[in-house]
Design a protein with these regions (language model features):
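N-terminal low-complexity, intrinsically disordered segments
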Residues: 16-26
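Intrinsically disordered, low-complexity, positively charged segments
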Residues: 1-9
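Exposed, interaction-prone extracellular/peripheral surfaces
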Residues: 8-13, 22, 31-67, 74-280
Length: 280
């Protein structure tokens, strides 16, 4: 609630709102009048750890995350909300929510620097934690401290290494805010590639995937399915809406459809009408 003005006391006014300074000057009781805050804080938590600099088709996950963040930010600006963000890539780049286009433009500058194919990836590797879960866990923990209760929070990640600590942070964050999870996936994580031998890397470790081997193919398919189900179950148990966006998707179309169908009550602050004003 924001202070608006003080006026003369009227019978029935809450005495807890007395403006004692004005009362002392005027010699007559005055009360403070408040106006409900209209600008809702919108926070974007963006995962740019090494594994996000990956795609077999379409755009890198990191680039897709930046596109989605831009769409949400401009939709928030169009709706009169305050835009802030937290980019985590081994280090945290934090932007407190700001009104108008300033907050969005500041966020975009950080995203351009952080998603550069060479500089962004190298910075992510240089500051990478021992596990990506550490980065997501600390980002969620930090967001709980800085986010004003009632904020609308979007988490953009592939959600690998999700664990019980992260699930606990999600629950605590959800208790006082509206939270939306956006999982960015590559087609390779939805179905195995054609039968062959492939070199694979997460940016830090290298390996071989032989889909000609029946055992490896089954294990790989099962691993992908289990990860998908684990993330979906974690979000469902905490009443957090979950959107899957592929690196080959049209981000604007997927986001607009999701907002119009799934977020009518939870995240109506950023409406589909506002999203339609944005084009990447």
């Amino acid at each position: 609630m924001d202070y608006q003005e003080s006026r003369a006391y009227q019978p029935g006014d809450d005495v807890r709102s007395m403006d004692w300074r004005v009362t002392a000057r005027a010699g007559y009781p005055y009360v403070k009048m408040y106006e409900e805050e209209r600008e809702r804080p919108v926070m974007l938590l963006i995962d740019l750890n090494p594994g996000m600099f990956f795609a077999t088709q379409g755009a890198f996950k990191s680039v897709m995350a930046a596109r989605i963040a831009a769409l949400i930010a401009w939709a928030g600006v169009a709706n009169g909300d305050r835009i802030g963000g937290l980019i985590f890539n081994g280090k945290h780049q934090e932007l407190q929510p700001r009104s108008g286009s300033k907050g969005a433009l500041h966020l975009f500058r950080l995203l351009v620097q952080s998603t550069d194919p060479e500089q962004g990836m190298q910075a992510s590797l240089d500051h990478a934690d021992s596990t990506d879960s550490t980065g997501l866990h600390s980002a969620l923990k930090r967001c709980r401290r800085v986010a004003k209760p009632g904020s609308l929070i979007f988490i953009l990640s592939d959600f690998y290494h999700i664990n019980e600590d992260i699930k606990g942070q999600l629950l605590r964050l959800r208790q006082h805010n509206d939270v939306v999870a956006i999982q960015i996936v590559d087609p390779l994580e939805q179905s195995p590639p054609p039968s062959d031998v492939y070199g694979v890397s997460d940016g830090e470790h290298n390996g071989i995937l032989d889909t000609r081997n029946r055992g490896q193919l089954v294990s790989y398919t099962q691993w992908c399915s289990e990860h998908h189900d684990s993330v979906a179950q974690a979000m469902r148990k905490r009443a957090i809406p979950l959107l899957h966006i592929s690196t080959t998707d049209d981000a604007a179309s997927a986001l607009r459809q999701f907002m119009s169908s799934s977020l009518t009550s939870t995240a109506g602050t950023v409406s589909s009408a506002a999203t339609e004003k944005v084009a990447l």
